[in-house]
Amino acid sequence: RFAIGGCAYSVANILGRAGASVTFVTPVGEQGVFGGFAAAQLAKLPFARPVLLPNEANGCCYCLVEANGERTFMSIHGAEYSFDPAWMARYAAERYAYGYVCGLEIEEKTGGLLVDYMKNAPVETWLYAPGPRGAGIDRARTDAIFALHPILHLSGSEAGALSGRDGLDDALLALHERTQAPIIATVGALGARVLLDKDTLLTVPGYPSSSVVDTIGAGDAHAGAVMLGLSRGMTLADAAALANRVCAKVVETEGATLSDEDFAALGLRED
């Protein structure tokens, strides 16, 4: 089945539906069936600011789900992975407490432009999710992002690959040496390992799920809930606990987007 999804979409979806003030900027290629579908779905979201590119094709992601709920992604990259700083000119006067970027866009040919934008963007703190391909991103781009002291949000395996270290805590400490900022590493049903500083690492226990349907979008929803908690003045540990609860609900659902009923049950909405 077709469904709207993707990293930043899932992050913004949690924030927007919870009543947070969020601006979701994403390019959409209008060529082909995928672009038309994506544009139509995004038009329904009050927080979405799609940049329509009429002469470019949009990509898609095929999600293969195993019996235990784990998933494998096969992506066809299109316009949605691109970036042009001109798209952000209308937001230059805004001020954002937090901004989100994932590594899939950084590795693209326009990724250097995105990194340059991040350096001078009206964003106080970046949350950066390097993703499963983060270790393969150009080192200079990664170093430039790390110099901005972003909060890293990644899985335990991603932390190991990106740092080149075997143990999770060793990996987080090695990454912290480069970012000098907190880190959240998700560890599945066990919850999250949170590094606050070089002397403080703690485990935030997972929240039980009644059943696991699939894990599509779970990590992205976790990142969105972390940003939601931080935007409401929570500590990073409390924000991670909130995110664990949201993540537990997402894995009980088919696909990346919670139904209105399931989202309401989380009690996140503030008007």
Task: Describe each model-derived feature in a short phrase.
Residues 2, 28-29, 105, 162, ...:
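Residue-level marker of alpha-helix boundaries and capping positions
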Residues 1-3, 132, 213:
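A short acidic, glycine-rich active-site loop
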Residues 168-271:
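Conserved phosphate-binding/catalytic region of the ribokinase-like
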Residues 39-53, 59-60, 65-202, 234:
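Ribokinase/PfkB-type carbohydrate-kinase core domain
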Residues 15, 155, 219:
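Short, conserved phosphate/pyrophosphate- and ester-handling motifs at nucleotide-, phospho-/glycolipid
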Residues 19-23, 70, 233-235:
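Short helix-capping/linker segments at secondary-structure and domain boundaries
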Residues 6-7, 30, 60-62, 70, ...:
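Gly/Ser/Thr-rich helix-start
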Residues 1-60, 269-270:
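Substrate-binding N-lobe of the ribokinase-like
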